[in-house]
Amino acid sequence: MKHIVFITNPISGTISKAGIPELVEVHLDHARFSYEFVSTQYAGHATLLAQEAAASGADIVCAIGGDGTVNEVGRGLLGTETAMAILPCGSGNGLARHLMLPMDLKRCLDIINLDTVETLDSGVINGHPFFCTCGMGFDAFISMKFAEAGKRGLMTYVEQMLREGLSYKPETYEIEDEMGSKTYKAFLISAANASQYGNNAYIAPHASMSDGLLDVIIMQPFSLIEAPQVTLEMLNKTIDKNVNIRTFKARHVHIHRSKPGLIHYDGDPLMSDADVEIEVKPKSICVVVNPHADEAARQPNMMQTAASELFYNMDRIRTQITRQGRNIQATNLKLLRKLNLK
């Protein structure tokens, strides 16, 4: 019989956890699993609890909470044979959604009962492990504002994005990987081990947790009129088609910026040095996965692709009109000068 330790963060996420012990008692397969519950008492406690569970021989440690709790539990299980399971109770649930776990907790317990475990990749940014995404720029800035807001949920995140997006200033970054070095002015830079931030906002639709690579996304500055397009393309899984997006895969990247600033790992913000090291750790964590997950569901469908193409063509037409307008203005200016009218 296998043993599961359920780690619950009583204050994380947007879902009450009061009924979860009863749900586990009713729906967990008791012929296959014994279990116990432990609760976190402070930030970082889930990592210690997960380490203790793994050291005592637990077969599975289940994180009950949001991406922050999942990150803490995952950190405690890196390099062990103890698998991490997830009962998603957060505001974004990025890793659970990437793994195509249902948001219904009973159905998640059904998946735990199937006991399908895979060894997947993780990442590290300046010494901090992550499992979904890490980055700097606007998303790290919003992660800080979100943490300061005092309330969770998608609407809080959107509110912070709308409030801060108009005034945020892009930075210049020098990015070096195995292929060389380039300099970009960017709104944000994200390194993705998994495909989304959470709430089905796909920053890296093609990211895989089993390819030994990170998807690096460089979002270059864009205009206010383009902001709705960027949002829609993230939800449509077509952000990689946007003309302001540059993507590549890498095992390791070194990023230099002009001064220290914010970074984030799985949505947790912190101040860091001007130099940032990001690397993948292949096959570093065992995870209970959904054996019925359809990988194709992470890719855009025909309607989503068509919407992306429409936006792309509109953007191209707008660019051409702008360029033609500038050419006409330049021609008119030359003509006026020849006529000594200007």
Give short role names for the model-derived ranges:
Residues 1-60, 294, 304-315, 326, ...:
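ATP/NTP phosphate-donor binding region
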Residues 10, 64-66, 89:
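Glycine-rich beta-strand-to-loop/alpha-helix junction loops that act as flexible
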Residues 17, 218-342:
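ATP/nucleoside-binding phosphotransfer catalytic cores, i.e., glycine-rich phosphate-binding loops
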Residues 31, 79-83, 87-191:
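Catalytic core of DAGKc-family lipid kinases
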Residues 46, 68-73:
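Short glycine/serine/threonine-rich phosphate/pyrophosphate-binding segments
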Residues 128-134, 183-192, 197-198, 215-218, ...:
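Short hydrophobic-aromatic micro-motifs
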Residues 177-178, 185-250:
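Internal anion-binding site segments
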